Amino acid sequence: MIILGSTGMLGQALIKAARLNNFKVIGVARSNADVALDVLDFEKLILFIESKKPKVIVNCIAITDLNLCEANPEKAYLVNAHLVAVLVDICRELNIRLIHISTDHFFVNDGNKKHNEASPTVLVNNYAKTKYAGEQFALSYQNSLVIRTNVVGFRNSGKHTFIEWVLSSLKNQKEVTLFQDFYTSSIDVYTFSEILLKIIDKEGDIINGLINIASSEVCNKEQFIRKFAIVFNYKNNKFNIGSIMSINGLNR
């Protein structure tokens, strides 16, 4: 199995869980991985995949910064969509199973409700648009699985994850924008990884297509951050109430 984006928040957790469960796995990232590779150099990416011929590729790579996706839509499309199209082509050629990690960012302005795979989607910004395009590329391949989710956890290096950003903001008494109109069913990366590995290891009845993997609970970003502050005993009076439509203030 090859995991693309193995040094990211989810990639790190998935690599660790895979090895604990005795999976043969190769982590790929630009640096500090089993294989250092710029996956946007598509020629090198294809040659690498051809040389390894894995049974499964898990794509954890994405630009998730909402502001960056708005500022540079071409880059967002390249990473969130076009890369997936390239992976589909090589996976189809070599009959490799492709697992593409997507997002729950399509469910906006419909309140506190749970969603299934048939729930209507809303492409509210460039992040949602490019991730949805990536889904469509992946789903054009019969031997693929697209997973919509909202994972939370720690990266411990590089740009802060949402959880790390929240902790840092609370600790340093920074202003935090709390979105009341964006609900999620966030799941921690380690629980998600264990579920995904069970799906990959499932014999006979292989799951393909589109599925959601999430928490059984639903809350908006305001509720999530306020609960987080209570659990970690942080008092922060610099909360601003905002809307996801404004984009500013949220790091996913």
Task: Please provide the spans of the model-predicted regions.
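NAD(P)-dependent short-chain dehydrogenase/reductase
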Residues: Q136-T184, Y190-K198
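Mid/C-terminal beta-alpha module of Rossmann-like enzyme folds, strongest
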Residues: I195, K202-N251
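Catalytic helix-loop patch of NAD(P)-dependent Rossmann-fold dehydrogenases
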Residues: L78, H82-L83, F106-I147, V151-F154
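NAD(P)H-binding glycine-rich loop region in Rossmannoid oxidoreductase-like domains
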Residues: V39-V79
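Adenosine-cofactor binding site in Rossmann-like domains, unifying the SAM/SAH pocket
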Residues: I26-L45
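SDR active-site strand-loop-helix element
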Residues: L4, V28, C60-I61, L98-D104, ...
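N-terminal Rossmann NAD(P)H-binding glycine-rich loop of SDR-like oxidoreductase domains
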Residues: M1-L20
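NAD(P)-cofactor binding segment of oxidoreductase domains
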Residues: A71-I99
